[in-house]
A protein has these predicted regions:
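Short, surface-exposed secondary-structure edge patches
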Residues: 62-67, 83, 97
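Loop/turn positions that initiate beta-strands
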Residues: 71-73
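A residue-level detector for short acidic-glycine micro-motifs
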Residues: 94-96, 110, 208
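Short beta-strand-centered aromatic/proline hotspots
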Residues: 87-98
Length: 253
């Protein structure tokens, strides 16, 4: 239960909290270490995003999103976290078997990319090597979307060229379609660059299983978004289940 403070007391508390945060960010900015200065940028981005999430909270309806199924890969904003907690925009796998469309939260396991120095045969407890499965699933989905999109762009360009020659005054009607295509192509390019990091394989961080607000979901939000229906195989999900049982229960496997 919150304290019963006056407006002036709340303002003083706010100013004290903001001053403390500003002092911390300034200390990061003034560091001679490039990596530490980078934290200032990431934290500032997160404060902006977090404020947006909080402002949107009262208007958010989980029913406006698609229904998420067990095994689906989603991209979420885990935030700016402490220590070794996973944070930032992250791919995760849904581990709930019956998440209601109206539920405001969902339970996920974060995924991370295999690094060149990673020894996938000797991972820490709570980590499961998934091989290239997430990468191949994402590449297949992107390729599936890219082909019809490129055809749409080709057909649209022909129509634009024909209209420009005969009725240049009607060119404005293509504006939205052109903007949509440009946005979708840019998104696909970014996704390709992003998932290339997972070429060496992916690891499920079962030890960092977490329940998040669906406000944090970046993609997919609808059945037509890039990540919709990209799933892990039942074999990989069974391995994640076994690790959850081993790590968080007294059941013998």
């Amino acid at each position: 239960m919150g304290r019963n403070l006056t407006k002036e007391e709340l303002k003083r508390h706010k100013e004290k909290a903001l001053a403390k945060m500003e002092h911390y960010i300034d200390s990061l900015i003034n560091s001679p270490v490039s990596k530490t200065r980078g934290k200032a940028d990431k934290l500032s981005y997160w404060l902006e995003d977090w404020s947006t999430f909080l402002d949107f909270e009262s208007r958010f309806s989980p029913s406006s999103l698609r229904r998420y199924k067990r095994g689906e890969i989603i991209k979420v904003h885990l935030g700016y976290n402490i220590g070794s907690e996973e944070g930032g925009l992250h791919y995760c796998v849904v581990v709930e078997k019956n998440n209601s469309k109206s539920s405001p939260v969902i339970t996920v396991v974060p995924l991370t990319s295999v690094k060149k120095k990673s020894d996938v045969d000797h991972l820490h407890k709570g980590c499961i090597y998934l091989g290239n499965e997430p990468y191949t699933g994402l590449v297949s989905k992107i390729t599936y979307i890219q082909r019809p999109l490129e055809k749409k762009v080709f057909d649209l360009k022909k129509e634009v060229d024909a209209t420009y020659k005969t009725h240049p005054e009607d060119m404005h009607k293509f504006q939205k379609d052109l903007e949509d295509c440009a946005r979708d192509l840019l998104l696909l390019k970014r996704m390709r660059n992003e998932i290339n990091k997972a070429k060496l394989g992916s690891i499920a961080l079962v030890g960092q299983i977490t329940t998040i607000s669906k406000i944090r979901i970046y993609d997919p939000k609808t059945n037509f978004d890039i990540l919709s229906n990209v799933k892990l195989s039942n074999e990989k999900l069974d391995r994640i289940d076994q690790e959850i049982i081993s790590n968080f229960t007294n059941r013998k496997i």
